[in-house]
Regions:
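Hydrophobic alpha-helical membrane-insertion segments
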Residues: 122-139, 275-291
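Membrane-interface helix-loop-helix modules in multi-pass inner-membrane proteins
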Residues: 52-127, 131, 137-144, 241-245
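N-terminal signal-anchor module of multipass membrane proteins
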Residues: 1-55, 61-64
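Alpha-helical transmembrane segments
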Residues: 7-18, 79-93, 120, 178-194, ...
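Transmembrane helix-loop-helix
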Residues: 77-92, 217, 221-270, 275-276
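Long hydrophobic alpha-helical segments that form multi-pass transmembrane helix bundles
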Residues: 124-201, 205-211
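Membrane-interfacial helix termini and the short, flexible loops that connect transmembrane helices
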Residues: 32-45, 70-77, 97-118, 205-215, ...
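Short, membrane-exposed interhelical loops at transmembrane-helix boundaries
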Residues: 299-321
Length: 377
């Protein structure tokens, strides 16, 4: 295994961490106004992600930073050509921080309601756009190799398969509308439904009483649609765009996870339902990266214009230094993440919440008098 392939896999792992963890953060925000009937329930719903949402965003920062360092050509091509979509996602993430942090600053229900709506919108948009973005990476984008000096397109026959053209760069030359196709829109529906169900299961797992039961019932209604739409999109991707038979393996595992989650949810076991849904999303991300390989960005204009893992990678010296750093720090990050979820494993008792008291205090999200949220037992 070359260092470039190793880092392609490591970046996939970082995206797994982000989408599985931030996925339920988005889902909680999406259902906040639907599930929370009053201020007490909305505060309890928000408290489920209170200790974790900002830490979960670190996975995105790390994935972006790793891409910049390990695959600079991939980073520059993607960010320069899809900057509008990525800017909207970034803006939503910033606004969501304001919605969560500023919500309790004023003891006014009108103030809180407005920020709840902001939170909801800033959760829905990225949930859809992430799916559209990853579907574009699988389907292929309007990419050509262009001379940086005069903007002339390099003929496809002159583009080497294992190196970059001197004085030229891969560029997304199509407009924003070329990224909007039935396949990419279905990809947006996939992430939207998966995150909705992920959030509902997390609230069911982390709360008690009527709120937990209503969240579980919501998941039971969402799970069939999420599973069916994901299966349709994944089969479309595999049959039309994947160049590897190996990508069937994560596809089947993802399907098994989502179906198992659906069955566990129907049996009333929200812990196992959430754990299996987590597995389903994780292997859906594995499937996306397996379908992309050996490219990091596929060209819909001509296969010769596709940006491969080898072409996009940094020098081996850079990748070696990054590998040593990752071997030192990544286990610590994983250990801390697991520990933080263990510390705040207690379920949240809705009845113990004072609706007039703002903020997500530690006593609210870490109540030793409540049972812990376990995954299946």
């Amino acid at each position: 295994m070359t260092l470039s392939i190793l880092w392609f896999i490591l970046i996939a792992v970082l995206w797994i961490g982000y989408l599985t963890l931030e996925g339920f953060d988005f889902g909680v925000g999406m259902i906040l106004k639907i599930l929370g009937r009053d201020e007490r329930e909305r505060r309890a719903t928000l408290a489920t992600i209170g200790p974790h949402w900002d830490g979960n965003e670190v996975w995105l920062l790390t994935a972006g930073g790793a891409t910049f360092a390990a695959f600079p050509e991939w980073y520059s091509t993607l960010f320069s050509g899809a900057y509008i979509v990525l800017f909207i996602i970034l803006l939503c993430l910033i606004v969501r921080v304001c919605a969560i942090e500023w919500r309790p600053k004023v003891n006014s229900q009108t103030w809180r309601d407005r920020w709840d709506w902001v939170h909801t919108v800033s959760a829905w948009l990225p949930s859809i756009l992430w799916g559209v973005a990853f579907a574009n990476l699988v389907q292929g984008m309007h990419i050509e190799v262009v001379q940086t000096s005069n903007g002339a397109v390099v003929p496809a026959a002159q583009v080497p398969a294992d190196s970059l053209v001197p004085g030229a760069a891969h560029q997304i030359t199509g407009g924003l509308l070329t990224m909007v196709t039935p396949f990419t829109l279905l990809g947006g529906a996939v992430t939207c439904l998966l995150f909705l169900n992920h959030g509902a299961l997390f609230v069911a797992l982390k709360t008690t009483g009527d709120l937990s039961q209503r969240a579980l019932r919501m998941s039971r209604r969402l799970a069939p649609a999420a599973t069916a739409v994901t299966a349709a999109w994944a089969l479309w991707a595999q049959l039309a765009y994947s160049g590897s038979a190996l990508s069937w393996i994560p596809l089947v595992i993802a399907a098994a996870g989502l179906i198992g989650s659906l069955l566990m949810g129907r049996s009333g076991n929200e812990g196992r339902a959430f754990a299996l849904h987590f597995v389903g999303i994780a292997f859906a991300v594995v499937f996306i990266f397996a379908a992309m390989a050996p490219n990091v960005m596929r060209s819909s204009v001509d296969p010769a214009y596709s940006l491969t893992i080898q072409q996009a990678a940094s020098a081996d010296t850079t990748l070696l230094i990054m590998s040593v750093a990752a071997a030192v720090f990544v286990p610590g990050v994983l250990a801390y993440t697991i520990w933080s979820y263990k510390v705040f494993a207690s379920r949240i008792n809705v009845e113990s919440i004072n609706p007039d008291e703002g903020g997500l205090h530690p006593t609210l999200v870490r109540d030793s008098t409540q049972p812990e949220a376990h995954f299946g037992y």
